[in-house]
């Protein structure tokens, strides 16, 4: 895969430039554009993934299906499709917006900061997973209600962005509705 960049944003969310992805994520990470996607199968189960230990931020942490950064000139929806192919080896239905204005800042135990405007999407797949070990070390298809209960009971066991997304009542409602409509 070619070198990825992040799209830097000002406080109003307006693009101001780009920076190489790995150079962008430091203890002083600038605000940038990302996306987060929750992927469901035909049974309405959510794919929960565990980030590879080689990941710079939050290695080994359980999270929602796929996250990433759109590239300059790339629509968020197209970036979701690209990363699902790259990380999971799957084709997906067109991503649907769940939480378009999600924004967060969090620091991992190693001091790496995520500082993102990060629209949240949901999509479906019927494809068999072909996991990219550089991205994902483990995965599990789970009932959404069980995952949400797990997040509520043990938020420390999941990525902070997943916890914050699930804490939004409207996003939670939309994810539940999405899971139920196979």
Swiss-Prot record:
Entry-linked SUPFAM superfamilies: Nudix
UniProt xrefs under PROSITE patterns: NUDIX
Annotated Nudix hydrolase domain residues: 30-164
Binding residue positions for Mn(2+): 25, 32, 69, 114, 116
Catalytic activity: isopentenyl diphosphate = dimethylallyl diphosphate
Transmembrane domains' residue ranges: none
Pathway: Isoprenoid biosynthesis; dimethylallyl diphosphate biosynthesis; dimethylallyl diphosphate from isopentenyl diphosphate: step 1/1
Localization per record: Cytoplasm
Name assigned to this protein: Isopentenyl-diphosphate Delta-isomerase
Species: Shigella boydii serotype 18 (strain CDC 3083-94 / BS512)
């Amino acid at each position: 895969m070619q070198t990825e960049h992040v799209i830097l944003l000002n406080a109003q969310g307006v693009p101001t430039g780009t920076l190489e992805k790995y150079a962008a994520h430091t203890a002083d990470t600038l605000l940038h554009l990302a996306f987060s996607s929750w992927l469901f199968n035909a049974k309405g189960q959510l794919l929960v993934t565990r980030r590879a230990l080689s990941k710079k931020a939050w290695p080994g942490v359980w999270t929602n299906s796929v996250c990433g950064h759109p590239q300059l000139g790339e629509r968020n929806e197209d970036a979701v499709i690209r990363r699902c192919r790259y990380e999971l080896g799957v084709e997906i239905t067109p991503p649907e917006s769940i939480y378009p204005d999600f924004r967060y800042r969090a620091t991992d135990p190693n001091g790496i900061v995520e500082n993102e405007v990060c629209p949240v999407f949901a999509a479906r797949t019927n494809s068999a997973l072909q996991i990219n070990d550089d991205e994902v070390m483990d995965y599990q298809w789970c009932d959404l209600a069980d995952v949400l209960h797990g997040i509520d009971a043990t938020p420390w066991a999941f990525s902070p962005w997943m916890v914050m997304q699930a804490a939004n009542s409207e996003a939670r409602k939309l994810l539940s509705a999405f899971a139920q409509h196979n």
